Amino acid sequence: MRNKKPPFEITNTMIHEIAEIAELVGKLTSTNQLSANPTLRRTNRIRTIHGSLAIEQNTLSLEQVTAVLNGKQVLAPPKDIAEVKNAYEIYERLEELDPYSVDDLLTAHGIMTRGLVDESGVFRSKPVGVVDQEGHVLHFGTLPQYVPDLVMELLDWVKNSDVHMLIRSCVFHYEFELIHPFADGNGRVGRLWHTLLLSKWNPAFAWLPVESMIHARQPEYYAAINASNDAGESTEFIEFMLSAIKASLIDAIYTSDEMSDGAMDKAAMRWRQIEKFLETHEFIMNADVRILCNV
């Protein structure tokens, strides 16, 4: 049945988190740092990709991911390098995607897993077990013959529900992983789609590295999935994800405040810009300094 509500409860914790997140989003967007600073956006995008792939056991460090995306040679497994390039490509096309389109979801999976899996850009044809980072089985995915209808039903619910998008996007994330529609790449695509949904609520989320925060709290991420699996509904996972989103916003605002004229004098602000650049680059050229410091 279309638009069937997935099982979850709206708790006081969620309501408080949503209020705080809305306030933080307002503060972040008022500074205009993300929209006005392409270097900061690229840095956050790289952190996003590194975080999401690291959750899936990609071995590249943040510095190596940066080097790959800067066109440099990196000594690493070809599969890991391909994952970085594929992920960057689809994140760069985020604005083109319709978050409620099954076809766009399949397109995103096709790009994310291009050259890496046989069933790329299509729903899986075989049963699959879902495991955590230690190889423990969390649950078994939906039988393949039911996957297309369940994904369509989930997207229809997300599109038509009047529940706040902050909650809807978290519900999608959990239910998508529960269905496990693809042979591989479910985690990467699920987190991408969560970001996509949030970006439709507020464009700032397209550049907010929530995936990096999930990676930093990976044991909690899997614990929340396990707890929700045991409960048969996604309430605990939603609460975890809202806390991760809030933490990402606080981090972004802190970075933004450090870069603002009100927080430091112009010379110190320029040094902070350069330090931030060097977090994801091996070196800095004179031309980069001129762009960063507007000199």
Give the positions of each predicted feature:
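FIC/Doc superfamily catalytic core
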Residues: 1-295
